[in-house]
Amino acid sequence: MAFDLHHGSASDTHSSELPSFSLPPYPQMIMEAIESLNDKNGCNKTTIAKHIESTQQTLPPSHMTLLSYHLNQMKKTGQLIMVKNNYMKPDPDAPPKRGRGRPPKQKTQAESDAAAAAVVAATVVSTDPPRSRGRPPKPKDPSEPPQEKVITGSGRPRGRPPKRPRTDSETVAAPEPAAQATGERRGRGRPPKVKPTVVAPVGC
């Protein structure tokens, strides 16, 4: 029994009919498309896809899905920037993107040491007596002569003088009750004035 060796199996025939995709990496094709288009405003996804289709003869059926995925990944990693739905290469001379909010102020070494010393001093319990209220007295100069107090007025100290205790000799006896009046009861008001008696001279 003879076999035809020139015919392969059905699976080999089917695999030979499938197109083989030997494509460069998508990030490489995307960067080449943006550089070739050279648009100062960037390129959108549709323009990049059309440029890749014009340069590559065979593309996989999921070409747009793969293109969207790689564009998103390149934007996250900073390889591309997106401005108004257009992709472009970042400017190498541009300053780094500033984050939100006010940047923290960098402390110098002296400020850091002072802050650390303040924290340590606050944790140590102070053994000094508590400071009284008010302004502390001004320190006296030992070279200055002592100032004498100037007494003005009568020299009497302020305030009410202390009450002096009474002695036995100064004790005043209580007045005796007035004797009961035996005469007529005195009426109210001022008593009438008594007129003086005029004595006639003798021999008139």
From Swiss-Prot:
SMART domains linked to this entry: AT_hook, H15
Question: What does the record say about tissue specificity?
Answer: Mostly expressed in flowers (especially in styles and filaments, and, at lower levels, in sepals and ovaries) and developing siliques, and, to a lower extent, in leaves, cotyledons, lateral roots and root tips.
| Major subcellular site | nucleus
Which Gene Ontology MF annotations are present?
DNA binding
Q: Which domain of life is it from?
A: Eukaryota
State the span of motif (Nuclear localization signal 1 (NLS)): 96-102
Q: Where is this motif: Nuclear localization signal 2 (NLS)?
A: 162-166
Q: Where in the cell is it found?
A: Nucleus; Nucleus, Nucleolus
Regions of biased composition (Low complexity) lie at 114-129, 195-204
Effect of altering residue 164 to G? Loss of the nuclear accumulation
User: Where do Polar residues bias regions lie?
Assistant: 10-19
Can you cite an annotated GO cellular component? nucleus
Print the keywords alphabetically: Acetylation, DNA-binding, Nucleus, Repeat
Q: Which residues bind DNA?
A: 97-105, 130-138, 155-163, 183-193
* BP GO annotations: nucleosome assembly; regulation of DNA-templated transcription
Query: Which intervals hold domain H15?
Result: 22-91
Where is the region Disordered? Answer: 1-23, 86-204
Q: How is it modified after translation?
A: Acetylated.
PANTHER family for the chain: HISTONE H1 (PTHR11467), HMG-Y-RELATED PROTEIN A (PTHR11467:SF103)
Role according to the record: Binds A/T-rich DNA with a highly dynamic distribution into the nucleus.
* UniProt-recorded name of the protein: HMG-Y-related protein A
Species per Swiss-Prot/TrEMBL record: Arabidopsis thaliana (Mouse-ear cress)
- Gene field: HMGA
